[in-house]
From Swiss-Prot:
GO terms for molecular function: GTP binding; mannose-1-phosphate guanylyltransferase (GTP) activity; mannose-6-phosphate isomerase activity. Co(2+) (for PMI). Monomer. Pathway: Nucleotide-sugar biosynthesis; GDP-alpha-D-mannose biosynthesis; GDP-alpha-D-mannose from alpha-D-mannose 1-phosphate (GTP route): step 1/1; Nucleotide-sugar biosynthesis; GDP-alpha-D-mannose biosynthesis; alpha-D-mannose 1-phosphate from D-fructose 6-phosphate: step 1/2. Produces a precursor for alginate polymerization. The alginate layer provides a protective barrier against host immune defenses and antibiotics. Its EC number is 5.3.1.8, 2.7.7.13. The keyword Nucleotide-binding applies. It catalyses: D-mannose 6-phosphate = D-fructose 6-phosphate; alpha-D-mannose 1-phosphate + GTP + H(+) = GDP-alpha-D-mannose + diphosphate. This is Alginate biosynthesis protein AlgA.
Amino acid sequence: MIPVILSGGSGSRLWPLSRKQFPKQFLALTGEHTLFQQTLERLVFEGMDTPIVVCNKDHRFIVNEQLANRKLECQRILMEPFGRNTAPAVALTAMMLVNEGRDELMLVLPADHVIDDQKALQRALALATVAAERGEMVLFGVPATRPETGYGYIKSTNDSLLPEGVSRVQQFVEKPDEKRAVEFVKSGGYFWNSGMFLFRASRFLEELKKHDPDIYDTCVLTLERSEQTADTVTLDDATFACCPDNSIDYAVMEKTQRACVVPLSAGWSDVGCWASLWAVNDKDIHGNVSKGDVVIQDSRNCMIHGNGKLVSVIGLDNIVVVETKDAMMIAHKDKVQGVKQMVSTLNDQGRSETQNHCEVYRPWGSYDSVDMGGRFQVKHISVKPGACLSLQMHHHRAEHWIVVSGTAEVTCDENVFLLTENQSTYIPIASVHRLRNPGKIPLEIIEVQSGSYLGEDDIERFEDIYGRSTPVERGVSVKTIAQ
């Protein structure tokens, strides 16, 4: 059995803590380790192969770093240039396995879910394996114990041909209003759709080809044109851009006659909103969850998350307060489903706070935006030992670098020289330059940018050891590409 970890997401539902370039699976929300790390760690047991991770190519270095931090392994990373939902991601993985002669069971799991009961998960997997070995397509359903409006539902029915404890999927139901959700819980036989699946690779491809041939055909061509190594699959941007955007549920599971459901009673949560995160965290005697430097007075059932500043609250009930360095979000706990719409509104306004935190992680290290004005920006840059930035040029800004600690190797046009603590240099506009850390300790510098445009997209790369490049134009038809 091969786990396939889907590590996509737009970072919108737990904004401002999650961002597009650092979505929630890479955050430590329910303990010391991140949701991504917890997902992989719960799959380390006998009979389970090392996983395949599917992620956005901009996240691949975060994935590698979080794997290394916990000494975790994955057999391959499949990198998408942009999201096309779950059906193409799983199809490409299944095709890759079948092409390699490994037509095995695929356990498809989101990277950002919480499962508290490991033994219950393994029992559900054992039952699901029996069904999947018979050619069934298994969906793990969480028994609906309360009228939850944030989940999709599955209506099940008995089928004597299935193993005991497994039921046939009768109907998929979109996220209901509260009245319908109450009816579902009262009537019984309804499950929350966990988004977790088990099926054989060839079975999924057979059903996908039957029910959504456009996705199937585009994925075949995408994989043929992708760059594959022993460790990674880098999808062809132009071909993948033509792939329809669809989920496993819509593309296959709602149409196939082989969909069945296995109950999963394992303390599952998709941590899909701030109310869900409040529910899975430890609380004080008044039902409050607090993180960071927080002082709570005369308040009940609140979620207060501080990230640097002192946050004090008085007389609040069922309120969520989330503070980060560059944004604050305050909402009633019953209204947190609206955070996604708020992020959409901010995106329409061109707000950068939805994309990145002030501290941004790169394969070579990180940078933190310290201050910004009309024609200047100040950054604190940290470069890992032995790492280097790309050989690059900016068309609209100059840069001043001041070394705070460590040693910097600077390339500026034809000149290459070293800087040590308290030394500085100037990088003129349109100069070809690079920063490298040749030392054994992190390199810390202060960068002062000045110019008419300071966006991160003002960059022309000439050499980059991490293989970063500008995305290709999208929207060309797959028929055109195939010619």
